[in-house]
Regions:
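Hydrophobic alpha-helical scaffolding
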Residues: 1, 45, 49-53, 82-86, ...
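Extended, charge-enriched "interface" segments that sit outside catalytic cores
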Residues: 1-82, 86
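Short coil/turn segments at secondary-structure boundaries
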Residues: 25-31, 70-80, 109-111, 138-143, ...
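Internal helix-loop-helix
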Residues: 60-61, 91-168, 211-213
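Internal maturation/activation junctions in enzymes
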Residues: 142-143, 154-190, 199
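Short beta-strand elements
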Residues: 187-194, 221-222
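A short core secondary-structure module
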Residues: 200, 204-238
């Protein structure tokens, strides 16, 4: 039974010996403010580190015994088009199910939305193991961190609507690239027009080369201010 965490000492060594780790945890846990309201919230630094160690061991077990063994079959089958949607390879759904059953979604999101409230440092360690097992699957699973954008810049209504969905396992993408706008995102021309009659925005244009582009929730970059041609006329739409 392989384990990409316990079998490889590097990640554990780095977390346990980082001189900044205690401060990172204190900042993320806001002096352990959740300990009285959430049963699984850490009581102190030692408790937090023990929780991270246990969680990363679960990630290591899934990546070593599910994701990595499935990688060859995923490559052989590939994604395919079916009834207007893109379907992952069958083993990719098996990978997602294993991660979802273990509760490994919304990892950095606050507990009040159903997240695990992990520091990005710990989430990145988990991400490294997933990428080691199957870099293609890592592209799907790790795009849960698109929700950070909504958490930082969205309204509280948007947070309550979308963050719990990601924490429950729905997938995400960030739709940026267009036929004439790749690395130069200031050239994005997907047009966003406000529909006053229906109280919503209408998007008209093209996107392409979108990683995980048939996800459940999309953050779409579009030009919302008519007559602009740089980054100041762009907005992100859910």
């Amino acid at each position: 039974m392989a384990n990409y965490y316990s079998d490889i000492n590097e990640i554990k060594f780095e977390l346990e010996n980082s001189p900044l780790m205690q401060r990172i945890v204190e900042l993320k846990e806001l002096d352990y403010a959740d300990k009285d309201t959430h049963d699984y919230a850490p009581q102190d630094f030692a408790d937090a580190m023990d929780s991270y160690d246990r969680l990363l061991d679960i990630v290591g077990d899934i990546t070593g015994n599910v994701v990595a063994p499935n990688a060859e079959a995923v490559d052989a089958e590939g994604a395919h088009h079916e009834n207007g949607r893109v379907r992952y390879a069958s083993k990719t759904y098996e990978n997602l199910q294993a991660m979802n059953q273990a509760g490994l979604n919304g990892m950095t999101m606050p507990r009040r939305y159903g997240g695990l409230n992990l520091p990005v440092t710990v989430y990145t360690a988990a991400n490294e193991m997933v990428a080691t097992a199957d870099a293609g699957f890592q592209n799907i699973w790790s795009l849960q961190d698109c929700i950070e954008t909504l958490y930082c810049f969205g309204t509280e209504e948007q947070r309550q609507k979308y963050i719990p969905r990601v924490c429950a396992g729905e997938t995400m993408s960030m739709d940026l690239t267009e036929p004439d706008a790749g690395s130069d995102l200031q050239s994005v021309m997907l047009k966003a027009t406000y529909d006053e009659e229906n109280g919503c925005w209408r998007l008209n244009g093209s996107k392409r080369f979108i990683t995980n582009g048939d996800s459940d929730i999309h953050l779409v970059l579009a030009r919302s201010e008519a007559g602009t041609r740089d980054g100041r006329g762009l907005s992100m739409f859910i």
